[in-house]
């Protein structure tokens, strides 16, 4: 909560802080679902010295929790960070269920649209976002160049 209140108003934060916030969010979701949802969280590479816009990655993970748990048999969410020489490869993958159209809320898709706008404004020509949405799986793959200290 402290990160969201105090650090998120800065223009850049350390990648360590952003990952700590995401890890805490994932741990909270694990407790919430008490083992009913498999949530993997992996970090590969060195995050020290890298900086990122705060709260940039959380909407992808929140989206996976929102859409990857309800109406899903044996739900899973995979979150993987790979950092190599200031290059971030961030992947979020979740199993999808069959949601009826009348169950979808009006805000569906707004979080991803906002992140796309932020990426275009803050990281022009420094990112590639690939979204794969099939009947069974939703996957986001973000590759971007991070600022170095």
Regions found by a protein language model. Name each.
Residues 145-149:
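C-terminal end segment of the histidine kinase catalytic
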Residues 1-143:
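Two-component histidine phosphotransfer core
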């Amino acid at each position: 909560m402290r990160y969201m209140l105090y650090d998120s108003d800065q223009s850049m934060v350390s990648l360590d802080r952003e990952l700590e916030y995401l890890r805490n969010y994932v741990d909270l979701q694990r407790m919430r679902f008490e083992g009913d949802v498999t949530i993997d969280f992996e970090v590969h590479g060195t995050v020290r010295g890298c900086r990122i816009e705060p709260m940039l990655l959380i909407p992808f993970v929140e989206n996976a929790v929102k859409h990857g748990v309800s109406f899903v048999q044996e739900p899973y969410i995979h979150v993987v960070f790979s950092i190599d020489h200031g290059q971030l490869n961030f992947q979020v993958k979740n199993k999808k269920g069959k949601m009826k159209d009348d169950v979808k809320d009006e805000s569906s898709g707004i979080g991803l649209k906002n992140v796309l706008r932020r990426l275009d404004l803050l990281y022009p020509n420094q990112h590639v976002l690939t979204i794969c949405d099939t009947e069974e799986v939703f996957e986001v793959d973000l590759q971007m160049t991070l600022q170095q200290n």
